[in-house]
């Protein structure tokens, strides 16, 4: 990691010097670099971050501050060069200070800045982008083959998404195709996956996912992509088959593939998709090896939970009981407790009393089961906790997904008892 920091800093320094090797010069001899040259350093650093060098974040902040100072200090004649105008606009769309763009536009007496673009960006950066969505869309088409084109297209996609998500995909496609291998493509692909998943565009979602996994799996934003991909797989299985999943995760290293399969197994388990849960947990266990480390233990947990509604319930109960509690996170301990409670009801002989009562399944919930980290790399974007019904003696809070799992199991048990009663098995 230190080597990556040095490499990013060194290459950025070379770019700051206009591509010339660094040499000792006095402050008086240091030339003032044009904004467009400085912007190249920022773009390089940001692209390095997107490709997996998380250590370049500090250099990115340094470059933003450096460019901000240079733009404010620049003579108005500097912007007679269209490349410097583009640099100022791209800087503003790359996390720069919006007030600096405002300052430059106010001083522009020569009409170097396209007032339409400047006004639209000021509204966008001021949180009013939806008011200029159509204008930005038109400008994305107009500037698509120019330096600012991919940036304007990305912004257009962002402001179009709330009202017309599928329409935003067109702008994201323009952005990523105009800036391949950059942070622009990373952002456009990631947001395209999210839109495709929410809109049930399975084929597009899978295609975008494979492109992202191939290029940006080491991005600091990749965990968001994994969230979307897991949702896509679980919601559309078996339409999305095992080969479809494998063709996407094959671009990932072993550790990330294992993480993805664990997250698929967990969500599939809680959603009652037991075939998918067993498949994913089996793949995660195979990737983890035979050592009883965290990932292998989690794979056993999810495989056991997924086996409860099957004829292998007895084996599942034994497997769940054999998992050491200290190797599970508090949330996964709560999941195991819920699964064991449901499993015990599955194998319990129904009685007349059980048909008459309406008591809830007793789950020993843990007060610390609201910890966010449920498994390696797992991120739950929803509410962390939800209250148990008042009928439970221990009125604490547990994971809402586990609450749903318990209620689903309780409902299935009730249906089974009703069928037995109708058939006269229970009197």
Language-model features, listed with the residues they occupy:
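Alpha-helical repeat scaffolds
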Residues: 62-70, 97-107, 129-142, 165-177, ...
């Amino acid at each position: 990691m230190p080597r990556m920091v040095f490499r990013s800093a060194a290459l950025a320094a070379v770019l700051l010097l206009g591509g010339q090797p660094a040499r000792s010069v006095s402050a008086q001899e240091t030339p003032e670099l044009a904004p467009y040259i400085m912007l190249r350093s920022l773009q390089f650093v940001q692209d390095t971050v997107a490709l997996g060098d998380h250590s370049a974040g500090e250099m990115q902040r340094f470059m933003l501050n450096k460019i901000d100072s240079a733009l404010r200090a620049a003579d108005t004649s500097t912007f007679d060069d269209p490349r410097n105008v583009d640099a100022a606009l791209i800087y503003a769309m790359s996390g720069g200070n919006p007030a600096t763009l405002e300052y430059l536009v106010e001083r522009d007496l020569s009409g170097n800045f396209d007032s339409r673009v400047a006004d639209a960006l000021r509204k966008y950066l001021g949180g009013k982008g939806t008011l200029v969505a159509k204008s930005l869309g038109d400008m994305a088409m107009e500037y698509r083959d120019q330096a600012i084109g991919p940036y304007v297209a990305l912004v257009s996609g962002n402001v179009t998404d709330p009202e017309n998500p599928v329409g935003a995909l067109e702008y994201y496609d323009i952005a990523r195709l105009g800036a391949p291998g950059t942070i622009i493509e990373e952002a456009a692909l990631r947001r395209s996956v999210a839109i495709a998943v929410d809109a049930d565009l399975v084929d597009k979602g899978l295609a975008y996912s494979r492109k992202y996994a191939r290029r940006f799996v080491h991005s600091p934003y990749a965990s968001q992509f994994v969230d979307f991909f897991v949702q896509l797989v679980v919601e559309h299985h078996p339409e999305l088959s095992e080969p479809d999943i494998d063709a996407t995760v094959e671009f990932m290293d072993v550790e990330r593939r294992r993480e993805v399969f664990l997250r698929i197994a967990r969500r599939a388990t809680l959603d009652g998709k037991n075939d998918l849960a067993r498949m994913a947990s089996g793949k995660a266990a195979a990737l983890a090896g035979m050592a009883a480390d965290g990932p292998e233990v989690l794979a056993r947990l999810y495989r056991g939970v997924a086996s409860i509604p099957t004829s292998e319930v007895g084996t599942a109960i034994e497997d769940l009981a054999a998992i050491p509690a200290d190797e599970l996170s508090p949330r996964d301990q709560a999941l195991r407790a819920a699964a064991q409670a449901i499993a015990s009801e599955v194998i319990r002989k129904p009685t007349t009393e059980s048909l008459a009562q309406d008591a809830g399944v007793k789950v020993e919930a843990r007060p610390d089961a609201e910890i966010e980290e449920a498994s390696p790399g797992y991120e739950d974007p929803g509410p962390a906790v939800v209250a148990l019904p008042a009928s439970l003696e221990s009125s604490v809070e547990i994971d809402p997904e586990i609450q749903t799992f318990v209620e689903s199991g309780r409902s299935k048990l009730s249906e089974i008892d009703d069928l037995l009663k109708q058939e006269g098995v229970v009197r």
